[in-house]
Swiss-Prot record:
The keyword Ribosomal protein applies. GO terms for cellular component: ribonucleoprotein complex; ribosome. This is Large ribosomal subunit protein bL36. SUPFAM superfamilies: Ribosomal protein L36. The keyword Ribosomal protein applies. GO terms for biological process: translation.
Length: 38
């Protein structure tokens, strides 16, 4: 999981999700693309 200041989709399968007031990117096909903001 990378912590970043600006989220960017690294592939078309990435989805932006808001959990507990923090934005995340999840990708079920390629889990190494996970990102978190905040």
């Amino acid at each position: 999981m990378k912590k970043v200041t600006s989220l960017k989709k690294r592939s078309d399968n990435c989805k932006i999700v808001k959990r507990k007031g923090c934005l995340r990117i999840i990708n079920k096909l390629n889990p190494k693309f996970k990102q978190k903001q905040g």
